[in-house]
Each structure stands twice: as structure tokens, then as C-alpha cells.
């Protein structure tokens, strides 16, 4: 069934910045998708097209991307008469229409908006829930409910505190279902709030971009200690593991790592070498139930990535390192730099390429963690994506803020719909199909 109309508009994300929304029309109705955007972005990401007029939205308007959809992509796609279920053909056509390596002409945010809407329409035309349609597109065997990695303490570029490392996450690996994982996450979150209030005062319980708390602490171990205490008070010691997103590219300076990077008068004699930072991570792993570290080093510090990967058995996630880009992923595979892909649909800019990135990673023994961005919308596509790709893990913020809960609540609905067929990844989150 062909696409009859495509209309894009500028809406706002969870940080109050403009973003792209697309309505795609077929005989069966209207299918809507909204595009997220990140705060800490890798230099190798596909290009998010912004207007650049500093007098309007501080340069962050997306009317160029909207116009590219309405005036270029829409007429070209409709003229071709593609069936809405031809996801790969449509995505390939849009990439050819753009003609650049990084989607810089039309904008990755323009192409992705249409790509997401096409997938939603394709599912309805096939008479399938979106997660089952994605599983069909990807050739997935059995669908799997993911372990949620709740980002409950925010630092780095996501918060105004002194904490250098960006995300401190809890993973309810010992839950028996996604619903139980949500309960665990929610309870720990509330115990954490009470503990932060007790230690640092009520004003320390304000939340960051992704719903996590941002107490004004500087020592990263203090963050881990807070998590351990909250997990213990909730009664889940041994059932909940810890994950971190260090976002080290944000504080990489002159070949070293500055854990006081938010201080303009930071003492360069205290900056850490890659080796010293590795030692710090090893101490985290030894002292706390840390099972996953993301972006442990700068996005081009291949040497330290490789050394750490060779010296640890935990999950090492590439985000800024790999930017969901098959070429970067292949380089990381060849260099043995990490063992898990952070999959962000807007880093690569289409559904087809997202599926291909996940398949390439899995074929080489990696895990895959599906991820939101810090600037999110109420769109729930990634909830269906993580189930359809059966990757076993998702991070989409704390159990707080509606744009985060929208995804978690969709996962609850999917688990309910699957009934007795629902499988929760649990301890097998790194390789749920084994």
C-alpha cells in the first residue's frame, strides 16, 4: 500500500529544544514519529540539521529539516509509489536522495523521522504489533523483554553538579519479569531519593535531563556508594547490578582525563592518564557490583579502549566510540575495543541502518543496548525496537519524567500482550538468545 501524504512539523523535545515530527498518511490512517536529540554527541554521528540562526531558538530550530521533508523527501517518495512495507528500499532511496556520507544535506533528523513513521505504518499494514514487525524486518528469532538500565544519578553534561561521570545506572538483572524489574527500579529510585535528601538536603533531589538525581557530589565513588545504599535499603542486594556511562570524551583534554572538568580552574596536575583511569574503573568493579561501563575513554582513544577490554570481563559499551555507525563498529571489532554497541537510532539516521548495526554487532559476539537520547519526546519506538531486535537491554532514563516512562510503560504493555510467551532477559542481558 503506497504512501499518500507526508507532513513534517517542528515540535519541542524534553529540554525545550525544537525537534522534528512526521505524520505519514496511507489508506489505513496517520502514522506519527518524533525524533530525539543528544547533549553529549559523538563527532562521528550522522548530522542533525539545525537552522543555525542564533536569534531564533539559539540556532537550534529545525525548520530546514522540516522543509526538506515537506518539499524534497515527501514528493520524491510519493512519486516513486513505494509500498509502505518496503522499509529498506525507502530508507535506501532517502539516503541516495541525500547523497552525503553523514546525511548532512537533508539532515539525519529529517530522514529518521520519515523512516520511523514508515516502520509504524508498515507494521499496521502487515497487521502486526510494531515489535513483531521489527523482528520480521531484522530476522529475529524469539522476541525478548529487556533489562532496563535506569539512569538514577546524573552527572557530566546532563547535570549542573561537579560529578564528571555522566550516568550511574541500576540494572534489575535478578527480576523474573519486566514488570518486576520496573517495581525494583521504582523502589530503589525512591529509597535513593530519601538517602540523598538525608545526606545533602531536599534541594539535592532535583532531577536532571533524564530523570535521575543530580546531587552536588564530586567523587564518583560517592555516587556508587549512594546506589549501593539505596539497593540495600530496598532489599535488592544481589538482584540489582550497576552500570555507568562515563562519557569520557566530554572530559578528555590534551591526552588526559579531567575529572574536575566543570571547574574552569581545574588543576591539570590532577588529570588522569588512560592507565590511571583504567585503575579507577578496576577499583569500581572490585568494590561495587558494576557490570557495564559505557564510553570509558575518549571516542578516538583506541589504545586505552583495547587495553581495558583485554583486562576485564564486564560489558564495555561503545557509544561516542561507535555512534551506531557500521564502519566505526567494524573498526572497534577489528581493534577489540569493546564488546557492546549502544544503539541510538538518531546517530545513524534510519531504521534499516539501525537494524544492520545491531546485526553486525551480534554477529561478532557483542551485546547491544538500545538507548534514548537526553532530549526525548513521547515517541515510544525504541521500546518496540528493543523487543523486536531481542537485544536484552535498554536505557531510557530514570523511572521519572513522562518522556522516559513512555518507553518503560510501552514495554509493560508489550509484556502483558505477550503473556505466557514473554521472556525477560535477566542475567542473560548481554546475550539473551543463548
Swiss-Prot record:
Chief place where the protein resides: cytoplasm
Family classification: Belongs to the enolase family.
Species whose genome carries this gene: Caenorhabditis elegans
GO biological process: glycolytic process
Binding locations of Mg(2+): 245, 294, 319
UniProt keywords, alphabetically: Cytoplasm, Glycolysis, Lyase, Magnesium, Metal-binding
PROSITE patterns: ENOLASE
Cellular localization per UniProt: Cytoplasm
Pathway stated in the Swiss-Prot or TrEMBL entry: Carbohydrate degradation; glycolysis; pyruvate from D-glyceraldehyde 3-phosphate: step 4/5
Name of the protein in its database record: Enolase
Active site: 210 (proton donor), 344 (proton acceptor)
GO terms of molecular function: magnesium ion binding; phosphopyruvate hydratase activity
InterPro entries referenced in this protein's UniProt entry, alphabetically: Enolase, Enolase-like_C_sf, Enolase-like_N, Enolase_C, Enolase_CS, Enolase_N
Residues given in the record as substrate binding sites: 158, 167, 294, 319, 371-374, 395
Manner of cofactor binding, per the entry note: Mg(2+) is required for catalysis and for stabilizing the dimer.
UniProt keyword Lyase present: yes
Cofactor needs: Mg(2+)
GO cellular-component term (any): cytoplasm
Catalysed transformations (reactions): (2R)-2-phosphoglycerate = phosphoenolpyruvate + H2O
EC nos: 4.2.1.11
PANTHER family cross-referenced by the UniProt entry: ENOLASE
Top enzyme category: lyase
Quaternary structure (record): Homodimer.
Entry keyword annotation includes Transport: no
